[in-house]
């Protein structure tokens, strides 16, 4: 697969990768990605994807979605995600669901997104449980029930998803259950990354409880440290 063949993922059947080669390419790709060497990362993901391994095909789709070493193109990303998802690979199912929910690269289809999130959750992707909670809370599809949102958020949090913890804590705070919210906020702050500290700081910004004020200060410190 290469940049000139965006449809290759949908045409080639999955094949058995050479032992260790795909893992090496994926590992090197991630290292390059972490170091900001996007062009090198793309080359590694592209090389790995030639095997047809769904993990590698998914990462090549991710590169096209995010613009890692290539022009950002969610439509091409959707082709690769679909190819990898056809084998039942959980992260490809999740990433494809994100595109359908946002209407990026494909026509927006919340119902299709919901089906894919369910499949991703069944494949062990905890983040999919959190998304099912959001879809239930906002009643994005007819099958979703707001009353089920806490169940999905709790399942996501128990499976280690930091956003599941944040959303579960948010529901507890809205219900006036500060004591129940604190463990989930603490778990999210201790294990989360990226925008999690900012989300927690915003969530508790107007709260007056001493425990939440202390948590807000800690979240703000972590945000500042991340910017250094």
Stretches found by the model and what they are:
Residues 47-59:
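Short, charge-rich amphipathic alpha-helical segments embedded
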Residues 25-32, 57-66, 95-102, 131-138, ...:
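Hydrophobic face of amphipathic alpha-helices that form TPR/SEL1-like repeat modules
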Residues 24, 56, 92, 128, ...:
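TPR alpha-solenoid repeat register
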Residues 1-31, 35-36:
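N-terminal leader/linker segments that initiate helical-solenoid repeat arrays
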Residues 20-21, 51-53, 66-68, 87-90, ...:
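Short helix-capping/linker turns of helical repeat alpha-solenoids
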Residues 2-14, 192-228:
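Terminal, low-structured helical/coil segments at or just beyond the last alpha-helical repeat
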Residues 14, 47-48, 82-84, 118-120, ...:
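Canonical positions in the second alpha-helix
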């Amino acid at each position: 697969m290469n940049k000139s063949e965006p449809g290759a993922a949908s045409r080639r059947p999955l094949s058995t990768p050479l032992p260790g080669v795909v893992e090496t390419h994926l590992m090197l790709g991630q290292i390059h990605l972490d170091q900001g060497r996007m062009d090198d990362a793309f080359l590694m993901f592209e090389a790995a994807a030639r095997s047809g391994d769904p993990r590698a095909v998914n990462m090549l789709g991710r590169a096209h979605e995010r613009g890692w070493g290539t022009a950002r193109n969610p439509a091409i990303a959707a082709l690769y995600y679909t190819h990898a998802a056809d084998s039942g690979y959980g992260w490809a199912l999740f990433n494809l669901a994100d595109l359908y929910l946002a209407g990026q690269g494909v026509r927006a289809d919340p119902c299709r997104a919901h089906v894919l999130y369910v499949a991703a959750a069944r494949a062990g992707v905890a983040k999919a449980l959190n998304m099912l909670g959001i879809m239930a809370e906002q009643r994005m599809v007819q099958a979703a029930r707001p009353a089920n949102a806490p169940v999905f958020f709790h399942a996501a949090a128990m499976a280690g998803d930091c956003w599941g913890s944040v959303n579960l804590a948010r529901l507890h705070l809205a219900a006036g259950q500060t004591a129940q919210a604190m463990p989930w906020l603490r778990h999210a702050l201790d294990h989360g990354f990226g925008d999690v500290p900012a989300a927690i700081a915003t969530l508790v910004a107007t709260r007056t409880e001493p425990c939440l004020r202390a948590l807000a200060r800690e979240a703000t410190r972590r945000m500042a440290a991340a910017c250094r």
